[in-house]
């Protein structure tokens, strides 16, 4: 279903779209400032995720890769284009070339408060795309990468429902499955250019089909122990463990956006 309206209204109308039309994944490449911090839009998209647990907003990271947006690290850093893209519970998408190199124009992190942004990377260079009013052309930008991530997410949502009796997944779980199964690029681990790496939808789908995730909860002061059995043999080269939660919305202009699990101390023991 194609749904077009003023962008400002779209964010605030997602509750209606979520319940009336069953919208679970959105994609948008609109910009709203550069290194804008925790704005009213940021708060809204984080609130969207709290009020609509299965929702995932997918955004472009922006095309200001060489800009200095006063983050404090000089040109080329901290230039994500819009507060909504800096949300804690959304995906901001970087643009990589066919050779898995970050495009020079692709906006870099971190977020205003130092968090990892962008979150994920996808092909956004020389993508054959539609062009208004009725044409097609090869286009480059994070606006080309963003729809690719939204499409992969839609397939992963469908895979989850097929493996769980038609039940909608939690948006936070889907975002963590996507990012934790990405192909690491750039510096080892997540970084401010590629996020968690280039999307690998097949590996994320396999994680869903194999049930390689745990949904659990823990109360304040509790200790929860989870055992993970790793298959033996030469075929296992790496174990990735990601702790994910949907964080409540913060106040506008908050210097530090995270509100929960501020004293959490995850510990991993290999036996």
Model regions: which residues?
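Subtilisin-like peptidase catalytic core
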Residues: 1-44, 51
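Hydrolase catalytic cores
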Residues: 121-188
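C-terminal subdomain of the subtilisin-like protease fold in secreted/lumenal serine endopeptidases
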Residues: 158-236
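Hydrophobic beta-strand segments within beta-rich accessory/binding domains
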Residues: 227-261, 267-268
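Sec-exported extracytoplasmic/periplasmic mature domains
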Residues: 19, 31, 46-53, 95-98, ...
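Loop/turn elements at helix/coil->beta-strand transitions in domains of secreted/extracellular proteins
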Residues: 1, 20-27, 51-57, 87-92, ...
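Active-site-adjacent substrate-recognition loops and nearby beta-strands
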Residues: 8-11, 34-36, 42, 60-89, ...
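A cross-family glycoside hydrolase active-site/sugar-binding cleft signature
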Residues: 3, 27-31, 58-62, 94-95, ...
